[in-house]
Amino acid sequence: MKYKLFRSPGNLDKAIRKHELVAVEIGKNIDDVADALIRAVRDDLAEMPEYAHCETAAYAPEPIQEHRRVIRYQYEMMGVVYPQYAEKNILIDYGVIEEAE
């Protein structure tokens, strides 16, 4: 299976055409590529100039939640940016498309 990772500029359900392809991973199932997708999210956030000098993290892919309106993605992920001097962390939505090779 092929897994395409997209970063959302805001809410995962909105502005679908503005989502950016971040990575493509190949594996037997989502569990096989989960670590690579987590690394891709962390690297993507770390490379963004506005998040320079910030720590980053990512949650493992999960099936799209029922409240989501987007039908393009089969899985969703959350990237987290930990600014050094801020009251709140920054959360970034990612979507994952699963397709046959």
Predicted regions and their residues:
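A short, exposed loop/beta-hairpin motif centered on an aromatic-Gly-Thr core
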Residues: 17-32
